[in-house]
Every structure is written in structure tokens, then in C-alpha cells.
């Protein structure tokens, strides 16, 4: 393996054995690819905006005199970049301009003579853009559009599994689902008639649809039935025999031919009889005359002389009819072939139930069903039926739908229109009848071949089309009404409906969600989430058990582990690590192809449909050196079932062991030893981990930590290789390698880092450089760590030394005992940033003012404000402190005579304003880290706003100047090299001003050209930077676009440092969660023989019943990993030579039979020193899931670092110094602090707000509510007979309004009595009864 310079700084020991065939693909590609497809120009017009425009345009006017055509579109540059949008609270979007062509025809001239053509670019609203990390900034907050898993368009055959009818009879149905348009359902009823429903309305006999398609009874019967021919010969009735049709029937008469009896009457006809009949080549047999009675005529039989119908199609024969037929001279009679086994007479029966006789009556019947109450006319009925399934504007199966439809009804091709035609409808009915006849299977709707993914791009396109269709109507009208000579395309288009539709989708759709930004993993998982809910999807209430369950086709596509607990379980899923979407929106997963038992490195992506019948081996199948299977029988999957298969039959093999699960689940080491329920909790809780002050890489990881950290976008990653030129806390400058340069550029990359900004969850986002000046970097190296990353690896928590033992009941019921040392070392200290904003509005009584001059407020309260009334940066504030002083005008009040007198004497002007300042919420204290003032255009900026503006300008100028100097330096260095090469002396150059170098003339023409080129570049660079600064200056100084009626907004950012404390929730990665019960002095904690105390004591009883044994293995492995670090520290202490370190490290990295090859000898001395420095805290270990370190390796590593192989140490009680009875499991576990902090939850109320109707106290911390004394709590008081307590609870402590005010007065007076009155809910009940029209009144006792 080749490690880059930064990867060599800390090499993670990998215990994986299987070779890595395929790297994990870019984790956010599902979002980015989909959106790119949406906004990129698509010449075919299949996808995205292009498809939407082409589907709506051209728009013809009603009279046909003009039309509006679409030419092309382009997206301009967005006005603000992502960061500016977040600060200003606006949407990151680009204006969409569309080139339209208005064609006007000359109505007097012959048809299609063009009179006038006008082209123009028209503004069509703003399209929100996706940031590089797959999010959208909507109104200043980052949002994610979650992909939706919905039922694919196409046709589905299903059954009710015998649940509808009491008899338990299975009723089959077929449903044609288009991408947009009306649903078409066919279904059987218990009497085996076939019915049709349109859009789930009332059912009609299915043959009505066929009649509406202009089919006669005869044609309908012809489509669905085979015929049986009878011949009348000399008073006997001969039947044409197809032996196969008789199988399973009971003979009602002797079947004989040529004097030989084949089957006697009353016997069942078997396959043996049929073989004999076929062998003897019997084609006709004689049947009794009454055999034809009850059979059904296949077409009309007419008496040719009189013209009367003897028997109509679909009518049953009687003996009389037979006589009439032979009289009319019919020698051959055709009847329908039906039987009870596999040729049911369903359509024939349905036709009898169908009251319609021709096309018109059928159309009228459909019209009545769709539009009840409207009088049907022939034209209306025809137009409605036509628009239901045959009009491209109203109905579209989409390419996916057509593909699924054709494959479902057995066509080989994918071609076909987006609308249905008559053969489509007939084929669906045929297949449904076949299924009812026992031929073919019903579909499994939970199969991933029948459910597809709708991602951002597709949903945005649909919304955009909705907006366009609204515009289309308006355009049509304007085209018909307006004066076409004067009108331009932009007069026709109103962009409002389009931007409204798009805005509504991004702002308030159920699938547009506030991004979960707790840590990098939660961001990545949120973007990879697949939801079955949302518009056009399921609802929680309706979703049954089957939809939520894990299906065999989820393998490698959707994670079977990561899903929420609670009502959404199974409806919200996560994409598996290697899964991706194909062009139709179905999920695919990669497999290695196996050819003749040889496993190749060729990787094929298969969707659930394609995977169908392949035999697929698992990733951990044992292979030989040559890449063939070692065992005779291999565990493999086929059609969703696992079993043993001979090795010659294997066709594919999994690519990786973590292919099955999602990213979050593959971060859990030793997942294979955990119970599924706990693994689910572990995967979900990692997403809730709060980034700690100092990130600490997990000692025991799984090897994909780096992928998550890099792909999440929280780190700064090198775009190109080079050498680090300079580094400070907020900027990294890299001189790019010569071979990666684009001709004609300065060759300097500048990375600006994000400092202390607030995330969506109020955690802190901050980037810290990890590289030093002079270090080489390659493309893709991590230059700066973000939140929860450590040297480019995901680091959600801290490695804690833990012991599994009870400790005085402090770890009862999953509680956690923590050492004080953890608090002192700030191991779990987190920073939370809150944004508090103060808005000054224009009110009816005058405008509010932000000022330090606040009535009735003492000096002390104003001490932290500046003269503009805004708190200064760096102030430490606590609950109740004023952050922004604001006064609101209040209406003139009537003064009492006394007040008037005082005013007259002291001449004091009435203070007609009230204090409405922004204060710190009660439970919060912290430091002010930033203040931003937004002022409306045209309102004068206050002093503070101007100060902030000056500061921003200064910063911007400094940034831009520095950037310019860096780039200028790079360019001038190239000039110097050129000049020196041309023979100019260096001394002379150093004496000159550097800019004069560009004016030197050289003799060599080629060199002179080069120099002139560089000079040109220099001028361009300067001009570009001047322009850049001007743009920046304009943005900073211009007024802000605030909501109507708002004059000024002041945003104050408050940083709160939260140490860990009792009541905080912590968890491991294996679903082992608990709450801190006590923080114990370090001297009381158990310690080992070396005197090392443990940090955390966990309850051993939390392990066996929960079956998450992975945590025990993690603890042992963690102990060994830390042991390596201790050993290195010991060697450093003894000041051993470098070669001994090399030998020790080589021994460590060579341990176990793994795929990883680390050659310490190949590292330089400096690299080894850096590695040693980074391994002092312990050796990071990767144990990939399902391919992790075996027990033997853990023991081997423990032995190498001189620790007991049992992983158990002798511990001593910190309080007494006595040893505990038996050895205790001690080791290192990766613990997370979850975002469920006691500070956010702790809350108490004495009196507060009450609900308006019931007058009961509100609930919840946000409303300063009380605790609910519910039904069960009432039972408890009843059970104890505590009558007075109960009375108090139900009256004065709840909704007895008079009682509670009196009670409060009494308490204030020191009189502790209560007088219960009438609870308000009783009055509410009275009102409700009266509202039902029953007069109910209270009678007083007196």
C-alpha cells in the first residue's frame, strides 16, 4: 500500500484479510449526481429543466394564430456565495433566464404563413443551487432533500390474500400506475366477474373499457377465448378434439372412437388417457346432443332467409336453438372453450353483467362514473375518455413505467409511448385472467425491483413542471386576447407561479428537511437517507408490517440495521455503503464477476431485477492464491435464499464485507458480535454525538473513518498536490506542483478555513490546520480538521479507560460512574453556539429603536452595552442580562390628576416608550463571540453597524491583498527564473523594484514572448483583484434586504461551554447507552497495580441480556492498542535508539495474517519520529466488520505489549486500598457524549402560563410548563386514599382559577390554607353539552 505524506503521520493497523477490490464510492453522489442532472443542459431533453421546458412548450394560442416556443435556458451566477447567504439569511440560488421565441402567423394568408418572429430572454425565477456538500441554503439555513422510495410506475398484479371476502377466496387484481395521470385498476369480485376502477372510484364491469375502445361482443370473446367446433353429421353431433383440453375433466359419457372406448362414463380423464388419444390420432369424437346445452356461442348466428338472430354471441345454447340452427342449415357450430380448472368464463360472465351495448353507451357510463351529476353529451364523454389514458398532457407512464410495463406483460423491448393503447389494456386483462387461471405469479410489491428512488433532481423537476403548467394556462389566454404585434415574450410570462412552486418545494415539502448537523456522520447519513414517506409515498398510519420489513432485495442496497426506532421504523432507511442508483432510479449494488470458478476483478452493478436468478457468493468465501474457491460447497444466495452451492455454479461474489450495511453501521467495530437491535441503537446514536473540544481518534475503528470525514466536507481537502507555503489558523496556502498546473496561472491554492461558526444543532463548527509549512501534500490529503475529525479521521467521542464492575449502586440500571479527571481534562467538554436575534420594526405608533437609553434600567444592567445599545464582543453574560437595548413606543395613556401635577412641577416629559430589549434566556450563560447588524436600505446605520462594516472592509481588503501578494509572488518568482535563465544578473534584479522586472527587454524572441505573456497575466491578475475587492465592498456596504416593516436586525452569537455533568447521556458504539449518575473524585476510583485509576465504571449486567458482545472485544482490543502507546512511551523514557523503535513498530504492523503491508524501513527517520509521536496515545486499529480481528490476534497483541491475555487486571478500591475479590475487565472503550444534555432538559415551574380554553398549566420547557399529573398518577393517589392531596391536584394546582389566585395570596400572607372551587374543565364540559343542544345548568346547594 502506498501512503501519502499526511497518511504516514499516523498509520492505522488494519486487521482485515479480504483484499479491497473496490473503494467505497463518494458518499454524497446520490445527491450531487441527481441535482447535476437536473440543472445541466441535456441535448436529448430526457432529464432536468430541459425535459420540463420541452414537455410544456411550444404553447399554442386557442385560435392557432400564434405560438410561444422554447429555445434554450441558462443559469446566471448567484449573487451571494454560500457563506454570505447563511449570514444574511437568504436563499443560495441562481436566476434562470430562458430564451423564448414568439411566432405570429398571418391569419389572412394561407395556412402557416409566418408574419412575425420575436426572440427574447425572459427571467423565470430563481432556482436554489446545491452546495458542494449536497445541501441547499434556504433562507440562510442548510437543508437536505431526502430521496424518496416510491412504488415504480408500471403494472402490478396482486391479490388480497383472501382477506376481503368472508369465504377466504383469493381475489386477484391488476393496477396500472402511471408516473402522472389516472390509475387504472382491474379486479375480480367473489363471483369471478372482472371489474375496472378508474382513480379508485366505483367499479364498472371491465368489458365497458373494451366497449369504449370500440370492440363488439364478438371481438371481445375472440380476444379472450379459444373455440370448440361441433359438426352436425347425419343426426349425430361430432366434436373436434384437442386431447390436452380434456385433462382433469370427468367424462359424462363414454369417450369412444372407431369402436374403441377410451374413457368410460363417470371416470376422470388422466394424462394416460390423453396420451392414448394422441397416439391414435383421434381428431373428432361423437358426443350426445345434450352435451352442447349450456355452452356459449362465440358469435351471432343469423337465419339468412328471415334475417333474425337465432342465437346471439355470448348466449347459452338450448336444444331448441340447436334445432333452429340445423333447420337454418348450419353444419358447423363454434362455442367458447371454458372449464373450471384453467379456462374460466370470467369475461363471458362479465359481459352478461355489462349493461352497455355499444361504444357510446360505454363512454356515457364512464362519464357518469367520473363526473356524477353532470349531463353527458357524446363529445364530452369522448373527450373525457380520451384524456384519461390516451392524452400525453394528462397521462405519462415515463420511460421507467413503460420499461416495467413491457417486462411485466412479457414483451422483450422497452419501446412504447408514454400513454396507453388498446393492446396495453387488453394484455393487462389477459395476464390478470391467466393469473386467476393459475398461470403466472402475482408481484411482490416490496421487491426493490418494484420500488424506485426519486432523488432531488427528479422531485425539483416535477415541481418546476407544475409551476410551468400554471404559467402555460395564463400564456394561452394572453396570446388569444392580447395585441400580438405589440406583445413581447416577457409580457406573456409571469415568473411568480414558477418560483412559488419551487420555493414551496424547497421550503416546506415533507422531504425538504432541516439538516442534521450534529457531527460529520449525521450530515452524511442525512444526505443518504431514503424515505418511504412524503408526497406520493406512504403514511405512517397506513404502512403495514410488510413494507417496513427487511426484504431479501435490500441486500447491498438498503441497510438492514440503520432505521429509526418508533413509528417510522422501516419506513426511513439508509443507503448501503456501495449502493447507487441506475438510470431508471432502481438501486444497484456491485458484485465481482466469477468466470468458470475463477473470481475476477471485474465489477458489475446489478439492480434487484437483474440480480434475479444469479448465484452470488458472500465476500468472506475462502479463496485460493489463484483466486478460485477453496471449498467444494460455498454459502451463496439465489433468489433471496441462502444455501450451499457447488463452486462451479457461482456466478458472482460480493465485493466487500460491509456491502450489506450503511456507513453508520460500518463504523461499529465488531458489529458481527452485536445483537441487531443494539446495533441499530449504536448506528443511530453515533449520529447524536456532540463534537468535543479536542477530537480524539478511535483507537479501535473499522477503517472507513477517513472516508466519512473527507466525503462529509467538514475538512479542508487538497484539490491539487504541492508544498505547504504558509499556515495560520484561518488560511492555508499551497504552492502547486509544476505537473498539476493549468497553463497561465499563478500556481497557488488558497484554502480559507471556517472558524467558530454555529451549526444547525447549535454545536460548534471550527477547522484546525493539520499541516506544517514545507510539508508536501498530494491531491485528496486532509489539510485541516473540522468538527469531530482528528488527522482526517472521523472522531466522534473519546477513548476512555473503563472497568466493568458494580460500584456502590452508582451504575444501577445502566447508570455511568465517571471520574473527576474526565472533567478536569475537558475530555467531554463541548462548545455550543446560540444565535439570539433582536428585530426593530416599524409599528403603528412609531418605529422601535435600538439604543442604550432604556427607561427604568440601572447602570449595572447597561455595563456590557456600547453606546449603540449592543453588547460588545467578549462580554461574559448570564441569564437576564441585556444583549441589545430596544425601546418600543407605547400609546398615550390617560394621566391621573396627581401625575399631571407632578409633571407640571418637575417639567418631566412623559416616557412614552417601553423596554423591549433582547435579554439572555434564563438558563443560559456564556461569552459573546460575534455580533452582526443588518440595516434596511435607506435607514441610517448606527455607530456599531458602521464599526462592523469598517472591520469587515478591513478584513476583506487584508484577505484580498494577501491573496494578491501570494499570487503575485508566485508569478514574479516565475519571471525571475525566466530572467535569470536569459542571462540577467541576480544582483541587478535584486536592486530593482520587482514590478520593473516585467519591463525588461530580452534579446531572445521566445523568452521575450514568455515575459510579455507573464506581464499580461500580471495585469489580468491585478484587474481581477481590483474587481473582486469592488464587488466585496459593494456587498458589505449595501443595505440589507429585510422583511417588510423591519428596520434593523441585530444577531448576537453566544458561545456556551458545557462540561460533562450528572444527568448527561453517554453511549458507546454498540447501543450501550446510559446516564451519568455521579462524578467521583479521582482518588475514590478503582485503580490497577501500576496505580492507574479508571475513568469510567460501567455495569457488567448491561452486557449479557443485551447481547452486544462487540463492546467487550472492543475493550480488550482497546487495552492492547493503548498498551502499544504505553510501550512506546516506556522506550522513549529509556531513550532507546531509533532502530529499536523501527523493529518494534514493524513487529506490531506485521501482527496477524492481514492484507495490510507497512514497510517501516521505507520511512525516513523524520517520518518514523512523526509516527512515534502520533502513536504515543495508542495504536489506532481498524477491524472491518465481518472481517475483523479474531480473538487470537487480540491475545497476540496483548502478549506483545506484556498485558494479561485475559484482558482482566487486578483492581484496588480507591477508598480503602483493598483489592477487589477477583480480576476485573479493564480496557479502552470509545465513548460518545450525546446531544441530550441535562442543561437543555432541566426545568422547574412554580406558577406560569395557562392554556386558554381549559385554564390548565401548559407543558414543556419551552412554554415554562408544569409536569402532567395524568390518569395513572391519579390512580396512585386514589389507591393510597390521599383524598386532600388529590383534591389539591385537581383544583388549585390545575384549573380552578379563583382557587389558585386565592391560594397564591394566602401563601404570600403566610396562611397555608386552600379553598377548592370549581375546576374550569367542568365549565368546558358544560359548554360542550350545551353545544349539542342540551341545556344543562348548575344548581347551588343553598
From Swiss-Prot:
Keyword Transferase appears in the UniProt entry: yes
Catalytic activity: RNA(n) + a ribonucleoside 5'-triphosphate = RNA(n+1) + diphosphate
Keyword Transferase (UniProt): yes
Signal peptide coordinates: none
Enzyme class: transferase
InterPro entries per UniProt: DNA-dir_RNA_pol_bsu_ext_1_sf, DNA-dir_RNA_pol_bsu_external_1, DNA-dir_RNA_pol_su2, DNA-dir_RNAP_su2_dom, DNA-dir_RNAP_su2_hyb_sf, RNA_pol_bsu_bac, RNA_pol_bsu_CS, RNA_pol_bsu_protrusion
Cellular compartments per GO CC: DNA-directed RNA polymerase complex
A GO molecular-function descriptor: ribonucleoside binding
One Pfam family matching this protein: RNA_pol_Rpb2_2
Keywords: DNA-directed RNA polymerase, Nucleotidyltransferase, Transcription, Transferase
Domain of life: Bacteria
Similarity-based family: Belongs to the RNA polymerase beta chain family.
PANTHER family attached to this UniProt entry: DNA-DIRECTED RNA POLYMERASE I SUBUNIT 2
Protein purpose: DNA-dependent RNA polymerase catalyzes the transcription of DNA into RNA using the four ribonucleoside triphosphates as substrates.
Record protein name field: DNA-directed RNA polymerase subunit beta
Classification lineage: Bacteria, Pseudomonadati, Pseudomonadota, Gammaproteobacteria, Vibrionales
Amino acid at each position: 500500500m502506498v501512503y501519502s505524506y499526511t497518511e504516514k503521520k499516523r498509520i492505522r493497523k488494519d486487521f482485515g484479510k479480504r483484499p479491497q477490490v473496490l473503494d467505497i464510492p463518494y458518499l454524497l453522489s446520490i445527491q450531487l449526481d441527481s441535482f447535476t442532472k437536473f440543472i445541466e443542459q441535456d441535448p436529448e431533453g430526457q432529464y432536468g429543466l430541459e425535459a420540463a421546458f420541452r414537455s410544456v412548450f411550444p404553447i399554442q394560442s386557442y385560435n392557432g394564430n400564434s405560438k410561444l416556443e422554447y429555445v434554450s435556458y441558462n443559469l446566471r451566477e448567484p449573487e451571494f456565495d454560500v457563506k454570505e447567504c447563511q449570514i444574511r439569511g437568504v436563499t443560495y440560488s441562481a436566476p434562470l433566464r430562458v430564451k423564448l421565441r414568439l411566432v405570429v402567423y398571418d391569419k389572412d394568408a394561407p395556412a402557416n404563413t409566418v408574419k412575425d418572429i420575436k426572440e427574447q430572454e425572459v427571467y423565470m425565477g430563481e432556482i436554489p443551487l446545491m452546495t458542494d456538500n449536497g445541501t441547499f441554503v434556504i433562507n440562510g439555513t442548510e437543508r437536505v432533500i431526502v430521496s424518496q422510495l416510491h412504488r415504480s410506475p408500471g403494472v402490478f398484479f396482486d391479490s388480497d390474500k383472501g382477506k376481503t371476502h368472508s369465504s377466504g377466496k383469493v381475489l386477484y387484481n391488476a393496477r396500472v400506475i402511471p408516473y402522472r395521470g389516472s390509475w387504472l385498476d382491474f379486479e375480480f369480485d367473489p363471483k369471478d366477474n372482472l371489474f375496472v376502477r378508474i382513480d379508485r372510484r366505483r367499479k364498472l364491469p371491465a368489458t365497458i373499457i373494451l366497449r369504449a375502445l370500440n370492440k363488439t361482443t364478438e371481438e371481445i370473446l375472440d380476444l379472450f377465448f379459444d373455440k370448440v367446433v361441433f359438426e352436425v353429421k347425419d343426426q349425430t353431433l361430432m366434436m373436434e378434439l384437442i386431447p390436452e383440453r380434456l385433462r382433469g375433466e370427468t367424462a359424462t359419457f363414454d369417450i369412444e372412437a372407431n369402436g374403441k372406448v377410451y374413457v368410460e362414463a363417470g371416470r376422470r380423464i388422466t394424462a394416460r388417457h390423453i396420451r392414448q388419444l394422441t397416439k391414435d390420432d383421434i381428431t373428432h369424437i361423437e358426443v350426445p346432443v345434450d352435451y352442447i346445452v349450456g355452452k356459449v356461442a362465440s358469435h351471432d348466428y343469423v337465419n339468412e332467409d328471415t334475417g333474425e338472430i337465432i342465437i346471439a354471441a355470448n348466449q347459452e345454447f338450448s336444444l331448441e336453438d340447436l334445432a333452429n340452427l340445423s333447420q337454418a342449415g348450419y353444419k358447423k357450430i363454434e362455442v367458447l372453450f371454458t372449464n373450471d380448472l384453467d379456462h374460466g368464463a370470467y369475461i363471458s360472465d362479465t359481459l352478461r353483467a355489462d349493461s352497455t351495448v355499444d361504444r357510446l353507451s360505454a363512454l356515457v357510463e364512464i362519464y357518469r362514473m367520473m363526473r356524477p351529476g353532470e349531463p353527458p353529451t357524446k363529445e364530452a364523454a369522448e373527450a373525457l375518455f380520451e384524456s384519461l389514458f390516451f392524452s400525453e398532457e394528462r397521462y405519462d407512464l415515463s420511460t421507467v413505467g413503460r420499461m416495467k410495463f413491457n417486462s411485466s406483460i412479457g414483451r422483450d423491448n422497452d419501446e412504447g409511448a408514454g400513454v396507453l393503447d388498446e393492446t396495453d389494456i387488453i394484455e393487462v386483462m389477459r395476464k390478470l385472467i391467466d393469473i386467476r387461471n393459475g398461470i403466472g405469479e402475482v408481484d411482490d410489491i416490496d421487491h426493490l425491483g418494484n420500488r424506485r428512488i426519486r432523488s432531488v433532481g427528479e422531485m425539483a423537476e416535477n415541481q418546476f413542471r407544475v409551476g410551468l403548467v400554471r404559467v402555460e394556462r395564463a400564456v394561452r389566454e394572453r396570446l388569444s386576447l392580447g395585441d400580438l404585434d405589440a406583445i413581447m415574450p416577457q409580457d406573456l410570462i409571469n415568473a411568480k407561479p414558477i418560483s412559488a412552486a419551487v420555493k414551496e418545494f424547497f421550503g416546506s415539502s415533507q422531504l425538504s428537511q432541516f439538516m442534521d448537523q450534529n457531527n460529520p456522520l449525521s450530515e452524511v447519513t442525512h444526505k443518504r437517507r431514503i424515505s418511504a414517506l412524503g408526497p406520493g409515498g406512504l403514511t405512517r398510519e397506513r404502512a403495514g408490517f410488510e413494507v417496513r420489513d427487511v426484504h431479501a432485495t435490500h441486500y447491498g442496497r438498503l441497510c438492514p440495521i440503520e432505521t429509526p426506532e418508533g413509528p417510522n421504523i422501516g419506513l426511513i432507511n439508509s443507503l448501503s455503503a456501495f449502493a447507487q442508483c441506475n438510470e431508471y432510479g432502481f438501486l444497484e449494488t456491485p458484485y465481482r464477476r466469477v468466470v468458470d470458478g475463477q473470481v475476477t476483478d471485474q465489477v458489475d452493478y446489478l439492480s434487484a431485477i437483474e440480480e434475479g436468478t444469479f448465484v452470488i457468493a458472500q465476500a468472506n468465501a475462502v479463496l485460493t492464491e489463484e483466486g478460485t474457491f477453496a471449498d467444494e460447497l460455498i454459502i451463496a444466495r439465489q433468489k433471496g435464499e441462502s444455501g450451499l452451492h457447488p463452486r462451479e455454479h457461482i456466478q458472482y461474489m460480493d465485493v466487500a464485507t460491509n456491502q450489506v450495511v450503511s456507513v453508520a453501521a460500518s463504523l461499529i467495530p465488531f458489529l458481527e458480535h452485536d445483537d441487531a437491535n443494539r446495533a441499530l441503537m449504536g448506528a443511530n446514536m453515533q449520529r447524536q454525538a456532540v463534537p468535543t473540544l479536542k477530537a480524539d481518534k478511535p483507537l479501535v475503528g473499522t477503517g472507513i473513518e477517513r472516508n466519512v470525514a473527507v466525503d462529509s466536507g467538514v475538512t479542508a481537502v487538497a484539490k491539487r498536490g504541492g508544498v505547504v507555503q504558509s499556515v495560520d489558523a484561518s488560511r492555508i496556502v499551497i504552492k502547486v506542483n509544476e505537473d498539476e498546473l493549468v497553463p497561465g496561472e499563478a500556481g497557488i491554492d488558497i484554502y480559507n478555513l471556517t472558524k467558530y461558526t454555529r451549526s444547525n444543532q447549535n454545536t460548534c463548527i471550527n477547522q484546525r490546520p493539520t499541516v506544517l509549512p514545507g510539508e508536501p501534500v498530494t491531491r485528496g490529503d486532509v489539510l485541516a480538521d473540522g468538527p469531530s475529525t482528528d488527522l482526517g479521521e472521523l472522531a466522534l467521542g473519546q477513548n476512555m479507560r473503563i472497568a466493568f464492575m458494580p460500584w456502590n449502586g452508582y451504575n444501577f440500571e445502566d447508570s455511568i460512574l465517571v471520574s473527576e479527571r474526565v472533567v478536569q481534562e475537558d475530555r467531554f467538554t463541548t462548545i455550543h453556539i446560540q444565535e439570539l436575534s433582536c428585530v426593530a420594526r416599524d409599528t403603528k405608533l412609531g418605529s422601535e429603536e435600538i439604543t442604550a437609553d432604556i427607561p427604568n434600567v440601572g447602570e449595572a444592567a447597561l455595563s456590557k452595552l456600547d453606546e449603540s445599545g449592543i453588547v460588545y464582543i467578549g462580554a461574559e453574560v448570564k441569564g437576564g442580562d441585556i444583549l441589545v437595548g430596544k425601546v418600543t413606543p407605547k400609546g398615550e395613556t390617560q394621566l391621573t390628576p396627581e401625575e399631571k401635577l407632578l409633571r407640571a412641577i418637575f417639567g418631566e416629559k412623559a416616557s412614552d416608550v417601553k423596554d423591549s430589549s433582547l435579554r439572555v434566556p434564563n438558563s443560559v450563560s456564556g461569552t459573546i463571540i460575534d455580533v452582526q447588524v443588518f440595516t434596511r436600505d435607506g435607514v441610517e446605520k448606527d455607530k456599531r453597524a458602521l464599526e462592523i462594516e469598517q472591520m469587515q472592509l478591513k478584513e476583506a481588503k487584508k484577505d484580498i491583498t494577501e491573496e494578491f501578494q501570494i499570487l503575485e509572488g508566485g508569478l514574479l518568482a516565475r519571471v525571475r527564473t525566466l530572467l535569470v535563465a536569459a542571462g540577467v544578473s541576480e544582483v541587478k534584479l535584486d536592486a530593482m523594484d520587482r514590478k520593473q522586472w516585467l519591463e525588461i527587454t530580452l534579446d531572445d524572441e521566445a523568452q521575450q514572448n514568455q515575459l510579455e505573456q507573464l506581464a499580461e497575466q500580471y495585469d489580468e491578475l491585478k484587474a481581477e483583484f481590483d474587481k473582486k475587492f469592488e464587488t466585496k465592498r459593494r456587498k458589505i456596504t449595501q443595505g440589507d434586504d429585510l422583511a417588510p416593516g423591519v428596520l434593523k436586525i441585530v444577531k448576537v452569537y453566544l458561545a456556551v461551554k458545557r462540561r460533562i455533568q450528572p444527568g448527561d447521556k453517554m453511549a458507546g458504539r454498540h447501543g450501550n447507552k446510559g446516564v451519568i449518575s455521579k462524578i467521583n473524585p479521582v482518588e475514590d476510583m478503582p485503580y490497577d497495580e501500576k496505580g492507574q485509576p479508571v475513568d469510567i465504571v460501567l455495569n457488567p449486567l448491561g452486557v449479557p441480556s443485551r447481547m452486544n458482545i462487540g463492546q467487550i472485544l472492543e475493550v480488550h482490543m482497546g487495552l492492547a492498542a493503548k498498551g502499544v502507546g504505553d510501550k512506546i512511551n516506556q522506550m522513549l523514557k529509556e531513550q532507546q535508539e531509533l532502530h529499536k523503535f523501527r523493529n518494534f513498530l514493524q513487529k506490531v504492523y506485521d501482527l496477524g495474517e492481514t492484507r495490510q503491508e507497512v514497510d517501516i524501513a521505507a520511512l525516513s527517520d523524520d517520518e518514523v519520529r512523526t509516527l512515534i509521536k502520533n502513536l504515543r496515545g495508542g495504536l489506532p486499529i481498524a477491524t472491518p466488520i465481518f472481517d475483523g480481528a479474531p480473538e487470537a490476534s487480540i491475545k497476540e497483541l496483548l502478549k506483545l505489549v506484556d498485558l494479561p491475555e485475559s484482558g482482566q487486571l487486578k483492581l484496588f478500591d480507591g477508598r480503602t486500598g483493598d483489592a477487589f475479590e477477583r480480576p476485573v475487565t479493564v480496557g479502552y472503550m470509545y465513548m460518545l457524549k450525546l446531544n441530550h444534555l441535562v442543561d437543555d432538559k432541566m426545568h422547574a415551574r412554580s406558577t406560569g402560563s395557562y392554556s386558554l380554553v381549559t385554564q390548565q398549566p401548559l407543558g414543556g420547557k419551552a412554554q415554562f410548563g408544569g409536569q402532567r399529573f395524568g390518569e395513572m398518577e391519579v390512580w396512585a393517589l386514589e389507591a393510597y386514599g390521599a383524598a386532600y392531596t388529590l383534591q389539591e391536584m385537581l383544583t388549585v394546582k390545575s384549573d380552578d382559577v379563583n382557587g389558585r389566585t386565592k391560594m397564591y395570596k394566602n401563601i404570600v400572607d403566610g396562611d397555608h390554607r386552600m379553598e377548592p372551587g370549581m375546576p374550569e374543565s367542568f365549565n368546558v364540559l358544560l359548554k360542550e353539552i350545551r353545544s349539542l343542544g342540551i341545556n344543562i345548568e348548575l344548581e347551588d346547594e343553598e
